[in-house]
Amino acid sequence: MKNAFKDALKAGRPQIGLWLGLANSYSAELLAGAGFDWLLIDGEHAPNNVQTVLTQLQAIAPYPSQPVVRPSWNDPVQIKQLLDVGAQTLLIPMVQNADEARNAVAATRYPPAGIRGVGSALARASRWNRIPDYLHQANDAMCVLVQIETREAMSNLASILDVDGIDGVFIGPADLSADMGFAGNPQHPEVQAAIENAIVQIRAAGKAPGILMANEALAKRYLELGALFVAVGVDTTLLARGAEALAARFGVEKKLSGASGVY
């Protein structure tokens, strides 16, 4: 078993990605052909569940782009289900300390290394037990990325980096800026200083730093500092802003929804 994304990070090859929030296998396949190294299937802020994640994994599978899946929380039951449907690389949100990082790793490993439940006869990941020795190979193929998104997590970064089985640390600029008192302004100088310091610290520890940044100049700056997995856009944003720009070029006035109140 191989994990091409994990291998690329270990080799120090920067991986450029795109965030998928449309929660749709058709759009996932369309974007899988765009050439990105990785695609993030978002189960935290997009309307995904195990079934929709599965269909997107199936849609991406024929293409070189590598899927990364973000569960809604650091929950061993949800992690187990995502691994069974075929996710190999997980981005675990809102990890605050080393204990939570260790729990994330344990959820991805079969015993005795972890607590992942054994259900390979039912699992797409094992090709329904058609992969010889899957139970003994799976642990090494898992790639665990944890998100640090608060001042507390930043203060615990050194101990998080010491956790065995953590392959990368992703800095969440939106939540971090909010926690630092600059909600909606991840480009604030104090936030940027925290991000840049974290990237250098993560790389120095031999782990892969990652981030989502649609600002092209900043994304390139993070890559120069040593970031190894950088998402440079979001599908919903590309569609929304692209559609608005096209309408504006033809003089169409932007209108708010006609619905009033909750709909």
From Swiss-Prot:
Keywords in alphabetical order, please.
Aromatic hydrocarbons catabolism, Lyase, Metal-binding
Q: What top-tier enzyme class does this entry carry?
A: lyase
Gene expressing this chain: hpcH
Give the positions of the site Transition state stabilizer: 70
Assigned protein family? Belongs to the HpcH/HpaI aldolase family.
Q: Which residues bind substrate?
A: 147, 174-175
The molecular function terms in GO held by this entry are:
4-hydroxy-2-ketopimelate aldolase activity; metal ion binding
Name it: 4-hydroxy-2-oxo-heptane-1,7-dioate aldolase
Give GO terms for biological process.
4-hydroxyphenylacetate catabolic process; phenylacetate catabolic process
**What GO cellular component term, any one, is given?**
cytoplasm
